Amino acid sequence: MNPGDLLLHLNPLLLLASLAAGALHLRDGDSEKRLLQRVSLGLLLGSLTASLLLLASYFYRTALEFEYVADYSAVELPLRYKLAGVWAGRDGTLLIWCWATALALNWELWRGSGAGEDSQPHSDAGQQRLLVLFASGILLALATIQLAINPFTHSDPVPTEGRGLNPLLQSPWMTIHPPIVFTAFGFAVLLYAAGLAALAAHGEAWLDVGRRWGRWFWLLTASTLTMGGYWAYTTLGWGGFWAWDPVETSGLLPWLACTTFLHAAVMSKRKRQYSLLGPLLAMLVLLLVLLESFVTRGGIWLSVHAFLPTQSESAAQRFLAVMADDTSVKGLVVLLGSCLAVTGFTTVRAYLRAPATEPRKREKLDEWLDEDTTFFGAIYTQLLILTVALVLLLMGVNGYLPGFVFETRLALFVALLAALFTIYTLQRWYEPRRLLSYCIAAAVASAILGFILLGMRPGSWMAGAALPWALLAGWATLRYLWSYRGKPLLPRLRAWGPYIAHLGIILIALGYGISYGLDQVETVELEEGSATEAAGFTITLDDVVMRSGDE
């Protein structure tokens, strides 16, 4: 057994020790058990860090005696692509996932200790302890799955040269994109644990933890979606920056769920609202991360991004085959199923125990369009967008769904979300009736422009339909930002931050509509030495050569 094997087998043992100590501390409050829990998790972080550094050193020297290194590295590769091999396959990415979870878990454990657990309200202290226990349990499952895809397995026989990194992956983006993705995955574990602790015990500690790691997850995932789109557009030649590929779509879902959670957390912090929905949304982020990982790792969906090649059988046959042959995917399915069961049980339990509330009566238009109602509408519209995208992802398991299927079914909900955002943002300055008239005018203009452009070219309706809503929502955002122009710098930046993010999303949505709505695609077939006219240019094919990303 080599040092890497020893470290990977040590991790579950450290987690078991941490769980035992944490459970005893939860029961009797013994400070020695609390110390043992902290020490165990600290050693776990050290073990995972050492594992990653050891694996990186093997890639650095191209240690072909290890099967994982031989699969993703070669002597002639540039150094940065050798090191990128660490996260080129399932084994290394899961190791990063475990490391990021342990990092966040230690941060929360020592942060709570530094703040003084004894000074916290009893309910918050108990909730904090539960949170650490729940996150440790999920990490134990991930560390156990890691044993089935061990990057330190020896090659038999040892090859004379490595396979190297796929030429499509030899891009500078490969050096930063995957590790950021799986670091965000690790932070999602803390989100789930925070939501579960909120449903299992009373207290307010979960909300600060959820908001902290939710923001990190949102920022990291947004950056990887942006980088991945640019990478696909400029390097890989996969048909543009967004193609609604199953892996792309499954990667968008956790970001949508986290976006919805962060919005719900705002009202949870301000008005103690969404006491059930908020934790449920936090838990949903990890559930969708596990689904995304299953889509990527399982080989069930037909995708150019998948780790495993798909076969020609039906989805059910592919699922049964991978469950029979791949222990790691089987473990992932068990973890996903277990988290779903726990989520369902705790949600129903919390719902049945929640005090009954009287439904609010609304008679006037102003009451239907007030702050709480429009915010509630925006939350559930985001959930509808998430649900439609998830259903379409599941429907496309046996074949590729073209982009227009997603676009036509999501467009109405995106327009509704823009209307609710405008009314919510501007109601402090304008009467609701006036804002509603603006939204109706935007809807009419959107329909007219979309219909006119649709007659010119299929798909161009998106550009016309998106423009009025982008102008309306953009104006609402700028009006809000302008209202803080005379405030001190720090309060101004705090108020501006979320709305600048909203403005960026508006521009992305408009850019998507223009880019894919007004693009023109023409297919030309050429043989070597031949030429043809296309889009006003003469295209000549001189030669066909494959080069690595550095050349």
Model-flagged regions — what are they?
Residues 1-30, 43-50, 64, 246-254, ...:
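Contiguous transmembrane helix-bundle modules in multi-pass membrane proteins
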Residues 9-19, 93-94, 100-135, 140-156, ...:
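A conserved hydrophobic secondary-structure block that centers on an alpha-helix together
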Residues 25-30, 119, 155-159, 186-207, ...:
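Conserved, charged catalytic cores of large soluble enzymes
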Residues 27-49, 110-139, 200-219, 244, ...:
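Membrane-interfacial loop-to-helix junctions in multi-pass inner-membrane proteins
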Residues 49-132, 146-165, 225-269, 296-303, ...:
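Membrane-interface helix-loop-helix modules in multi-pass inner-membrane proteins
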Residues 260-290, 520-522, 533:
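Phosphate/diphosphate-binding loops
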Residues 538-551:
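Extracytosolic and intramembrane catalytic regions of membrane-associated proteins
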